């Protein structure tokens, strides 16, 4: 399978247009039920005097019925304002269905300082090394007299740092525990915990004159209840509490972030093809809310917010998957 894309922007009064090119090839392999592919992209951005060409090889293998190995490896050549540099990166994931109830994923991601591939809309992340695992366990309840039909548990452990280890180095943990009831209602609990400290990267950005900022331990707890989804009107209640940031003896320097929220919403389902979603309100209150102002400058505010939203889902046709 082949794919090709090319685009040229017109010049404006104030800048020259960009030029894009991309080529994609993908092949199926009979051995290991695998797939391999190749992607190259080229971008010329004369308005900022930058050219970049990326070459990426991706793969997807299934060593067994229950396991899968997939990812990609790539390099990029960049010439910006007369400076030439080359970057490398890769991403690898391995999944295995241990039992019908237990699913496990392992991942390893790496991108060096020069692996800046944001020219064609990729996620901008470089100078990063992350490793972790994800586990999901579903346990059906065979006791028909119980109101609980199934319990669901998921867990994720993540370590993330810069390539040289000067930033990051913290360890974060996520877990999600949910009860599914026989009437199709559900009750779920979630927690994000940063339980090993690291060096903050977002606010310092390797700026030489920036202060050393340590990312402290913290946690955010969330709970959500959904009424039976088989009813024409479903109600959803949710609440959360979190505490992160930096705490000092000086009140003016105290950047400890305390937050809490609660909300209520409805889902109206008059038919199988139409759905109306109304978030009546979500109240949020947060101290020392951090917001990016410009490079290496953040503002901190006490935030209080009430928000509402409305959306409509309409399925055209009668076939749904």
Segments (PLM) and residue ranges:
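Short strand-coil-strand connectors
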Residues: 30-32, 62-64, 99, 182
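Short, flexible loop/turn elements at secondary-structure junctions
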Residues: 6-8, 27-29, 40-44, 63, ...
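A conserved hydrophobic secondary-structure block that centers on an alpha-helix together
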Residues: 1-50, 58
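Intrinsic disorder/low-complexity signal
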Residues: 57-59, 312
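Exposed, low-structure sequence patches enriched in small/polar residues
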Residues: 50-52, 68, 72-321
